[in-house]
């Protein structure tokens, strides 16, 4: 994995925060703006946030009957709405795919270098407690970062929308996809 040292003078307030739907529900009022990517309006109607954008589509990379794949128009709507917003919370259901790719595109639109934006978002991704499978009561618990797996179709649309070479974001994601356990 390639990890860059942040070199930008761009305000860290312009780096979106990524969470899952349950975390977003609990902390949405700590943020100036909230972007829901994926879940339907009825799933987040209890947020009650005054600056809340909802863009609904399924977490798929090809079209299937009965499912909505992310489109170029979805991506344009996400980035256009999110660009320039400081203290932005971006979430989907699991906080792993639609939200990570959307936040990444917004960070790039805010002036972050694609690799730097990826590294910053990934390094600030939530830590989760995982219990290893063990039938005994002394099972081992490890801490590791939540999976950070940007939706490839969203990335493809982002590359086009942001004027990047085709494959740029998908290559960065493919080269930085390994997640190691933390020493905690």
What are these regions (language model features)?
Residues 2-55:
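Glycine-rich, flexible N-terminal cofactor/catalytic loop recognition
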Residues 34, 71, 75, 147, ...:
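A structural signal for well-ordered alpha-helical scaffolds and beta->alpha junctions
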Residues 53-90:
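Helix-loop module immediately N-terminal to the HCX5R catalytic loop
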Residues 2, 80-87, 105-184:
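PTP/DSP superfamily signal
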